Amino acid sequence: MSLQNIIETAFENRADITPTTVAPEVKEAVLETIRQLDSGKLRVAERLGVGEWKVNEWAKKAVLLSFRIQDNEVLNDGVNKYFDKVPTKFADWSEDEFKNAGFRAVPGAVARRGSFVAKNAVLMPSYVNIGAYVDEGAMVDTWATVGSCAQIGKNVHLSGGVGIGGVLEPLQAAPTIIEDNCFIGARSEIVEGAIVEEGSVISMGVFIGQSTKIFDRTTGEIYQGRVPAGSVVVSGSLPSKDGSHSLYCAVIVKRVDAQTRAKTSVNELLRGI
């Protein structure tokens, strides 16, 4: 049986799986899937085009099963001790492994095993959860969190305190996705499998989930669950039908132009290894 078939079958019986009852074949399939996610060979979601993604549900199921097959244990990062089922990505890394990986991880940066970080990315004191994929040249700034199975594109900037939602709890059907060359402003939250399409700029303090109305003030269109490519988005509100109150929304104020790009450009000086 293929990895996928083993995982799919085991997931149907997940309630009966424990660290002591898991079949050796299932355990190895789960661990191999996590290894492939960790190396970037496998992704929870694969891009087909702008705004178009294929979700590998079985890989997400393997992430969930990994919590069923392992006991908590004491983990040590050299400074602190933890009690968890998932070791950190860098727990056993040598200097050569860091050099070969080609990204920077500053003190305070935490990535869990099963996450992937590509070359020239920068991890400030931040958190990257299991199953996440951080692509080349991305900046994960201070106190930003990349949730389980989230997909972060090339040259994305996640500003300080940004939250990118995961899929494990509450259980989501699709991962949250930030496509290539996007800028997410400080303290913004993108969650519930929402997609920010290529080249978009999200201002600070914008909150987007599946039910958030995203209003294009130029066309009057309302989007939900996705930000169209090249959008500049700020927080706003829309009036109720009777005019008695307003509710939060995100507003597309314009399309990205040269002025916007100049303000949000990637600094290559920070990424050279």
Curated annotation (Swiss-Prot):
Keyword Cytoplasm appears in the UniProt entry: yes
Binding partners and assembly: Homotrimer.
The protein's name in its UniProt record: 2,3,4,5-tetrahydropyridine-2,6-dicarboxylate N-succinyltransferase
Subcellular location: Cytoplasm
Pathway it works in: Amino-acid biosynthesis; L-lysine biosynthesis via DAP pathway; LL-2,6-diaminopimelate from (S)-tetrahydrodipicolinate (succinylase route): step 1/3
E.C. no: 2.3.1.117
Binding of substrate, residues: R104, D141
Pfam family, one: Hexapep_2
Transmembrane region(s): none
GO MF, any single term: 2,3,4,5-tetrahydropyridine-2,6-dicarboxylate N-succinyltransferase activity
Keyword Cytoplasm found: yes
Keywords, in A-Z order: Acyltransferase, Amino-acid biosynthesis, Cytoplasm, Diaminopimelate biosynthesis, Lysine biosynthesis, Repeat, Transferase
